[in-house]
Amino acid sequence: MQNKTVFVGISGGVDSAVSALLLKQQYREVIGIFMECWDNTLNNDQLGHRAFNEHKSGCSSKEDFREAQAIAQLLGIKLIKQNLVEPYWKQVFLPTIDAFKNGLTPNPDMLCNRLIKFGLMRDYCKQLDPNSDFATGHYAALSWDNNQPLLAIPKDKHKDQTYFLAHVKPAQLQDVVFPLAHLLKTEVRQIALAHHFSVATKKDSTGICFIGERHFSDFLKNYLPVKPGVIYDWKTQRQLGSHEGVWFYTTGQRSGLNLGGQAARNFVVEKDLKTNTLYVSSDPEDLQRRGITLSHFNWLYQPNPLTQTVLVRIRHAQPLVQGHITVQPNNVVQVQLDQPIDRVTNGQYGVLYTQNGICLGSGIITASQI
């Protein structure tokens, strides 16, 4: 039993509930933190919102808070509700919209973890108790090298969330605890059922960090204008149809193209922001890339000597692919892959790992090579 306080993020889901339960067995005091980061009304979130479209309340954050309160009451712990709607809007959401405007496909979860969860929220907890630890229900693990915490792949490889954590600052991992590091998701649900948690069978949350599931192109229309343009065949340059604006589409996307009558199903292979043009293809090889340029690289771990052979992931849950890196000036890392991967998308993140599952860090994909 650790004679100190641990703050734990409680979202109203099963993972954070079981995390809080496990921490109660390990710490003198456990305090739950519920982060409210999105307001449907203030943020004009109507188009694409499933609850609004189905004539429901649309107040998923209120429902989540009620679940969090029930968990805290069952465990006998204090729960603090922290309103972070404004900083989330300014620091995470507006930069995300700006990236879409620039033709990129950003990942707001990366910014959210760095700036909100492990930024403002962790800092707030440290202000309340400088000696406290900070815990979340992420499926991630920590290893150690000379008192430096290293982000590592957890036991449950299928639920591994280290991809989303790879852009936090190294210092933000100090005094952090991941209670689910050595558990499978099935084991987490079994623990929740055994302790009669109402969220034991609750569906896993998906969608955008703190916003949830949306019909995504419709959701973006709350914040970006419709701007009709032309769709061309990537190889023949033949005009195939029209679209509503390149920022509503991403590399590899098949749905929403409305290209009926084609011999094979097409997908997006290129976006030209200047001319507002989409290029599509039905040949999967047109999506494949062997080289990736990562900019603004955030090093979580730099072993000495730095390994040149790494494992690479360009999206959550994608199988790891081996590659070789060249470190360039200005925090740029060039990756050459041993085998091609598809749907390499500018604006997304490339995350690098050692062969034994330690996360080296992440960078924003700014270019790719055939």
Swiss-Prot record:
Compartments annotated for it: namely: Cytoplasm
Residues that bind ATP: G9, I10, S11, G12, G13, V14, D15, S16, M35, G137
Q: GO:BP terms for this protein? A: tRNA wobble position uridine thiolation
Record key words, sorted: ATP-binding, Cytoplasm, Disulfide bond, Nucleotide-binding, RNA-binding, Transferase, tRNA processing, tRNA-binding
What Pfam families does the record tag this protein with? Answer: tRNA_Me_trans (PF03054), tRNA_Me_trans_C (PF20258), tRNA_Me_trans_M (PF20259)
User: A GO molecular-function term, please?
Assistant: ATP binding
HAMAP family for this protein = tRNA_thiouridyl_MnmA
Q: What family, per the record? A: Belongs to the MnmA/TRMU family.
Q: What does this protein do?
A: Catalyzes the 2-thiolation of uridine at the wobble position (U34) of tRNA, leading to the formation of s(2)U34.
The name under which this protein is listed is tRNA-specific 2-thiouridylase MnmA
Look up and give the organism this protein is from. Mycoplasma pneumoniae (strain ATCC 29342 / M129 / Subtype 1)
Q: What is the lineage of its organism?
A: Bacteria, Bacillati, Mycoplasmatota, Mycoplasmoidales, Mycoplasmoidaceae
